[in-house]
Amino acid sequence: MELIVGPRLFSTWSLRPWLVLRRAGAVFDTREVWYRSEAEKAELRRLSPSGFVPLLKVEGETIWDTLSISEWAAERYPEAHLWPVDPTARALARSATAEMHSGFHALRDLCGMGPDHPMAGDARSPAPSDPGLDRDLARLVVLWSQMRERFGAGGPWLFGDWSIADAFFTPV
């Protein structure tokens, strides 16, 4: 099994399934690919149906996208309890994960993961008055507070025990 990821210092999308697979106890190799040059982009398009990372090569199949890889791991390694056991907590963990996967655009655009990222630095620092970032941060505080208040008694993570939701919010 091979997880193909983007640059480890910069790719939050790649970090998420790597964390999930590690937490599941999966044995896998990791290959880091870059996509700066046209040749690198062409190689990535050859490897990935979507042309993006991450992707998981397993049993002759290619699974792409952070959420798909994470769901595959939850089904493949049920003993790892990658989603909360409680049905309500599980549904809300999936909702929070999907929201991070598809939302928080200003946060992801303006607040990169790595300090050495080409888009980081004083010139790219978000202005405190950025309305999109303000909305994203306010939503993040509400979301985390609600999940911890409702489900956090069992441990230090968003839903008490570690879950895929924690992997998706780790880069934040």
Task: Identify the meaning behind each predicted range.
Residues 1-127:
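GST-like domain detector, emphasizing the conserved glutathione-binding G-site
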